[in-house]
Amino acid sequence: MRVPRQWSGADLKEALSVLGYEETRQTGSHIRMTTRMRGEHHVTVPDHRVLPLGTLRAILRDVARHFECTSEEILTRLLGSG
């Protein structure tokens, strides 16, 4: 599955809520999100209009590592929710 190229920080924030991530704080244009599913895990999401593809892939890879699955599986769960 291809990574969406026009996702904003707000889009990613909304999608990550499916996996139990909640906004815990915001500093400037960066949002810190935390999940307590399968242990506590934090990711920082830039609140930009369009996320750079490498940034989006890195966040998905980090989330996948936490949930012990592939980035493809995470992306399927996120896109399947909407």
For the regions a protein language model found, what residue spans apply to each?
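A short, structured beta-strand/loop element
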Residues: 22-57
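Glutamate identity and glutamate-enriched acidic tracts
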Residues: 14, 22-23, 40, 68, ...
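C-terminal structural segments of small proteins and small subunits
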Residues: 51-82
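Intrinsically disordered, low-complexity segments enriched in small/polar residues
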Residues: 7, 26, 37, 78-80
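Short, flexible active-site loop motifs that bind/organize anionic cofactors or intermediates
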Residues: 2, 46, 64
